[in-house]
């Protein structure tokens, strides 16, 4: 994995694309909190140990790599779109918006953007390549996945202090059994996504019971 993940990006360098940026997001599925996107440009000779898809790493390894990536990257940016905008424009468009905002924060203009998934970022005229499962194939996408994931987790830890009854520190807003039980018991808080099920179901049920 260590060798292959960097070899994947080098294939693009060898075709004349450099620098290359990886884009990924964290937080499309949760019932609460923002969606976060990150974009990362790594040096040609980058060789970060244990770099992989953030979902395949322990929390401790992600946090260590988070700092290494920020120190190693030629450029990077992280942006978010909050739950209110997610409800207004839908999660897919909110994800594109977060990615667009992150791209526009870069000081370095890449020759190519590698995007995790099968959808290009709408509204951007830059050269884009979609990579299904890219966070496990491409070093720069894997790096972006880690920055996005750790950044979002840190935000959710802060929200956990504001809204302790939901225990966001444990599930980061995902729809775990404990989270749904807390929703049913305490209702929603300001960072819940009102258009997501079962949040909207719980809201409807609460209205019926009034």
From Swiss-Prot:
It is found in: Cytoplasm. GO terms for cellular component: cytoplasm; ribonuclease H2 complex. It is an enzyme of class 3 (hydrolase). Its cofactor is Mn(2+); Mg(2+). A divalent metal cation binds at residues 24-25, 116. One of its GO terms (biological process) is mismatch repair. Its main location: cytoplasm. Residues 18-208 form the RNase H type-2 domain. GO terms for molecular function: manganese ion binding; RNA binding; RNA-DNA hybrid ribonuclease activity. It catalyses: Endonucleolytic cleavage to 5'-phosphomonoester. Transmembrane segments: none annotated. Keywords: Cytoplasm, Endonuclease, Hydrolase, Manganese, Metal-binding, Nuclease. Manganese or magnesium. Binds 1 divalent metal ion per monomer in the absence of substrate. May bind a second metal ion after substrate binding. Belongs to the RNase HII family. Endonuclease that specifically degrades the RNA of RNA-DNA hybrids. NCBIfam families: PRK00015.1-1, PRK00015.1-3. This is Ribonuclease HII. It comes from Endomicrobium trichonymphae. The gene is rnhB.
